Amino acid sequence: MAITSKMVKELRDKTAAGMMDCKKALTETDGDMEKAVDLLRQKGLAVAAKRAGRATSEGTIQTYIHGAKIGVMIEVGCETDFVAKNEEFCKFAKDIAMHIAAVNPIAVSREGIPAEVIEREKAIYVQQALDSGKPEAIVEKMVVGKVEKFIGEICLVEQKFVMNPDLTVQDLLNELVAKMGENISIKRFARFQVGA
């Protein structure tokens, strides 16, 4: 199939990828727009992984207050002040602050979850599985699955994004890294709730 400039522009508008990347993705997928979007997203993951080790000493702090009852402050880091002042970068930080207000994660990543929290949940799941009368081999698999699900619910980057449940927060972060062309990281956040 012949790849037209209109197709390249449409894909570029959807993904914010470079023109040559869009043309290459359309060529590789024989003009299939959806497959090209998926291919560019996969490449975005590779770009994010390549940039992950780079220092993020610039960034922004954004806040979100919901109904004067819940407040969130978040620090999102990047490599340059050019990106730190970018409207899309700041919107990303604000959107993640709203997400935190709604979903209440306890840590940015798995590494930030206190071991005692995971051990306490694991003990509960083991007891529940044993009480159900399942064999021990199955109990272990059930517990591993439940612990993984629990981590996905309390770990910010593994949570489904509230404004688009098809993506995780990490997916959004990877897309932004690919668009901005530099490493971006969610450094930390604080969530406050009246009466909590």
Curated annotation (Swiss-Prot):
Annotated GO MF terms: translation elongation factor activity
InterPro entries: EF-Ts_dimer_sf, Transl_elong_EFTs/EF1B, Transl_elong_EFTs/EF1B_dimer, Transl_elong_Ts_CS, UBA-like_sf
Localization in the cell: Cytoplasm
Ranges for region Involved in Mg(2+) ion dislocation from EF-Tu: 80-83
Xref: CDD domains: UBA_EF-Ts (cd14275)
Recorded GO CC terms: cytoplasm
Xref: Pfam families: EF_TS
Keywords, alphabetical: Cytoplasm, Elongation factor, Protein biosynthesis
Function: Associates with the EF-Tu.GDP complex and induces the exchange of GDP to GTP. It remains bound to the aminoacyl-tRNA.EF-Tu.GTP complex up to the GTP hydrolysis stage on the ribosome.
PANTHER family: ELONGATION FACTOR TS, ELONGATION FACTOR TS, MITOCHONDRIAL
UniProt family annotation: Belongs to the EF-Ts family.
Protein name: Elongation factor Ts
Gene: tsf
